[in-house]
Amino acid sequence: MGIQKVMVIGSGLMGSGIAQVCAQAGIQVMLYDVAKDALVNAIKSIGWSVGKFIEKGKLAEDQDTIMARIRRITEFHDGKEADLAIEAVFENIELKREIFQRLDTICHPKTLIASNTSAIPITELAAVTNRPGKVLGLHFFSPVPMMQAVEVIKGAATQDDTAAAGKDFVLQIGKEPIMVNRDVAGFVINRINFPSAIEAMNLVEQGVASVEDIDKGLRLAAGRRMGIFETGDMVGLDVTYGAMKAMYEESGDPRWYPPLLLRRKVKAGHLGRKAGKGWYEYNEDGSRK
């Protein structure tokens, strides 16, 4: 039967995207956030995105049918019937640990608990639960409705059938699983992408090339749909910083240490599109100036 009910914790860019692709796949979704306003905005964003997919002929169902599968919740216990709970909050290990402890308490013993973390070790999150064998990583990429890959990460205690269920779920929602068999900092894709991003930031700081020209070069010469800095603004500079910092703290490897330019941007509040300014500047509607 596959996964029938999913609880998504966090209604930001990633959480709302995960909720959307689950609903589009026929799964009942309980979208949790402590902030009611955030949930309202998330539903509006999801509705707009679903509408665009329908306009392009990529979805057979109507918007109302898909949106009816998403239920907003502000109490944890309202998600207790989930077959799978996916945590999708920002990269703060203490917050994630707290969420995993609460999920472990309220969810059925058979419920799988996953994190969308891009860098924090799954093993550390599993350790605060009484079901480490049923904990895994499901790392989606932004924007979730558009990106096809999902990393399925095994922690040290993750059971084989849990990883297999994670793989099946990814296929169920129309994505492609990337199986990560060891719980290393940054998993697979970020360990490949981050060195390029760090070098790009260093080149800007050294005055070798501009943000615009580096992004243009990557689009035209490397076949990327978006440049490194365009992607960074969409994801959020604070998210990138948090992921790099987590990888550095986990591994002790200085190559993952967030570059000075990124650290300064984050301290200044230039967090990307959501803040109106990051590597680029944005209008109120999110379009680039």
Protein language model features and the residues they cover:
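Structural/interface elements that position substrates and couple domains in central-metabolism enzymes
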Residues: I189, N193-E199, R225
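NAD(P)-dependent Rossmann-like dehydrogenase/reductase catalytic/cofactor-binding core
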Residues: G2, A25, A164, L171-V180, ...
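Rossmann-fold dinucleotide-binding core
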Residues: L112-D183, N190
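Rossmann-like NAD(P)-binding element
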Residues: K52-L112, I120
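Acidic/polar active-site rim loop that often engages polyanionic ligands
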Residues: Q24-I27, P143-I153, R225-M226, K245
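NAD(P)+-binding Rossmann beta1-loop-alpha1 motif at the extreme N-terminus of oxidoreductases
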Residues: M1-S49, K56
